[in-house]
Amino acid sequence: DIGEPGPREVLIRTAAAGLCHSDLHFMEGKYPFPCPAVLGHESAGVVEAVGSMVHYVQPGDHVITCLSAFCGHCSQCTDGHLSLCENKGTELVRQPGEPPRLSRSGGEPVNQYLHLSSFAEQMLIHEQALVKIDRDMPLDKACLLGCGVVTGWGSAVYAADVHPGETVAVIGCGGIGLSA
């Protein structure tokens, strides 16, 4: 079962989801994660409903999910260091006493992988865990932007310090390698 959107949450109809190697690591038990859980973190979909405080998106908007969600108002976020958000573990999840976003029919909570769980027909996520995209962008391609594309691009630009016009060799031609 999936809950109703809280004040800063968005309900999304999943249109496409990529299978990342990170998902495979969790499925194989190489990375610990509490079960039951719904995996998946590369996804695109269409907004179905929004919480009372959400103003960035509205029903019908096309969106991609972001695994690097942030609160938007702590000192790290306001200083432009979104990946260092001080409130990731508190504000982006439901609090004790609140109904879970995902649950089994008996009410048992189901954990959300990276606060997303895109291997489901619908996702209920924090508003800061998505980005609105142009309606003309194919959702089956857009879903790869949230992890593989930004990981490959970030590896080339930030880790390898590659600049326009330079020649590089990329070893591997998966989604990340092709995006580097």
Question: What is the meaning of each model-derived region?
Answer:
Residues 121, 128-130, 134-180:
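Mid-domain Rossmann-like dinucleotide-binding core that forms the NAD(H)/NADP(H) cofactor-binding site
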Residues 1-17, 27-78, 83, 132-136:
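Glycine-rich beta-strand-centered segment in the early N-terminal region that forms part
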Residues 38, 42, 114, 118, ...:
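Conserved active-site and cofactor/substrate-binding residues in soluble primary-metabolism enzymes
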Residues 59, 109-111, 139-143:
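Flexible, glycine/proline-enriched loop segments at strand-loop-helix junctions
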Residues 67-128:
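Cysteine-cluster motifs in flexible loop/terminal segments that predominantly coordinate metals
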